[in-house]
Amino acid sequence: MAPLFIAIVLVLLGIVSVAFLIAGAATACAIALVSSLMWVRSAGVLARQLGGTVVTAERRPNILSATEAARLVDVAEGLFAVFGLPGAEIRVLDDPAVNAISVGRSPDRGVVFITSGLVLLLDRIELEAVLAHELAHIMRGDTVSGSIAVLAFDPLRRYVPTFARIADKVAGNDREPFADLAAVAVTRYPPGLISALEKIDGAPIRRPSCLSRSVAESTSRLWLAPFDRRSDEPEGPGALDLAERVAVLREL
């Protein structure tokens, strides 16, 4: 619950402080109330913005063959059981980019989005490692703080530069390395995630083109392989790049 508590406190304190400066106490209280409601709705809103097709044993996106979809479902259901997330779901984004992201305001409402390009690129062991990484975000509460950073702070960064730093703090600059470690603790096979990250690092496209520009920009730091807000280039200063994350995993 710690990441959730910290995220809520930062949202309320940040927005209330700015409101006091701009419009006084009454407006501050009103905005604080709205931001609290935003927390409740944030993950659902972000999930709808991302879109994708839910993948189950009975349903698959056209981009995946029956065999590919069955492999994805089998791996996902096994990890749902290990993590204790029976209510989680997998959605596939029909896009050649190779990336994944997770959202959800609580563990029993988590959603993992994975691009079709990544599903087709990875073998079963690598796919398991990537899904474990994203489910670890859900279990750690990273998806809550990430959703709040996107919906509460990102729209304000254009007008108040300080909010760019606040958004990054709320999202968590160290979220990916910690999720890497949590994933290999579950799979007990670091080479699987190492191989997946190396393949992603060597792929030409990280930024999904199926997303609107605003959604891609606001979520850029929340993906398995973060990318620059304005381009497909890897994320800049403050983010641990994939090669560094691989180096950490090799030490295990």
Locate the predicted segments by residue.
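Catalytic Zn2+-binding segment of zinc metalloproteases
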Residues: 135-151, 190-191
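Hydrophobic or amphipathic, alpha-helical segments that drive membrane association/targeting
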Residues: 1-99, 157, 166-170, 204-205
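An active-site-proximal "capping" alpha-helix that borders the catalytic cofactor pocket
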Residues: 76-80, 172-189
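Active-site-proximal gating segments in proteases and membrane effectors
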Residues: 82-109, 164, 184-252
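Short pre-active-site segment immediately N-terminal to the catalytic Zn-binding motif
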Residues: 64, 114-129, 170-173
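Active-site recognition of the HExxH zinc-binding catalytic motif
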Residues: 114, 129-137, 141-142, 179-180
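Short, non-transmembrane cytosolic segments of multipass membrane proteins
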Residues: 99-116, 125, 138-139
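Hydrophobic, aromatic-rich membrane-embedded alpha-helical segments
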Residues: 149-166
